[in-house]
């Protein structure tokens, strides 16, 4: 029903009528990527493409979260069911109703979890730190409401490491690198 509803949400009304891009509040990534997606600096209503794109991005996010948390384990059907709330929770379903903003909100979530894909326990993780800085900046420049996702995933991974009885020093190094990368990315 969301794809077929063809109803403009609050922010969509002005964009449909005037075609402006101004996502505001420092959302430069959203402004620039919207030029690529819409093929012009003047936005036109290309829904339901934007909603479908947001759904696809959230599906990718769900798979990446499973890969991050399960590491090398095989993904089973109950893991997929457990990951469904990532893209289908009631709080994010509202975001799909924004015809113009939905893909950039989903991208912000992708930017928030992407650094963990590059975290490897066996190396020095310079790539993890650099990608954390870049992805945190991109998250903040696309949709700042996703700012709490990175710290929460950091906590989940640290608790998982603790539960797996890993060395406390490794856990602290992971947390410190995550905090440093996150803070630098926000600055």
Where are these regions (language model features)?
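Juxtamembrane "helix-exit" motif on the non-cytosolic side of transmembrane helices
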Residues: 2-10, 37-40, 88-98, 162
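Short hydrophobic/aromatic helix or loop-helix immediately within or flanking a transmembrane segment
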Residues: 21-52
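Membrane-interface micro-motifs in multi-pass membrane enzymes
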Residues: 23, 27, 54, 77-120, ...
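Extracytoplasmic catalytic/substrate-binding loops of multi-pass membrane glycan-assembly enzymes
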Residues: 2-15, 21-33, 143
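Transmembrane-helix motifs of polytopic, lipid-linked glycan transferases
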Residues: 52-73, 114-117
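Perimembrane helix-loop-helix junctions
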Residues: 149-183
């Amino acid at each position: 029903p969301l794809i077929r509803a063809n109803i403009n949400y609050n922010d969509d009304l002005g964009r449909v009528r005037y075609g402006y891009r101004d996502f505001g509040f420092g959302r430069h990534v959203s402004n620039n990527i919207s030029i690529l997606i819409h093929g012009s600096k003047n936005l036109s209503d290309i829904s339901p493409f934007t909603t479908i794109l947001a759904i696809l991005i959230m599906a990718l996010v769900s798979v990446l979260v499973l890969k991050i948390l399960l590491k090398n384990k095989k993904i089973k059907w109950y893991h997929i069911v457990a990951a469904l709330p990532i893209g289908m929770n009631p709080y994010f379903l509202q975001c799909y109703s924004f015809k113009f903003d939905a893909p950039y909100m989903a991208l912000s979530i992708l930017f928030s979890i992407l650094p963990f894909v590059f975290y490897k326990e066996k190396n020095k993780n310079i790539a993890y730190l650099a990608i954390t800085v870049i992805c945190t900046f991109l998250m903040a420049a696309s949709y700042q409401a996703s700012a709490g996702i990175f710290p929460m995933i950091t906590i989940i991974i640290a608790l998982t490491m603790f539960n797996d009885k890993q060395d406390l020093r490794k856990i602290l190094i992971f947390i410190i690198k995550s905090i440093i990368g996150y803070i630098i990315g926000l600055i």
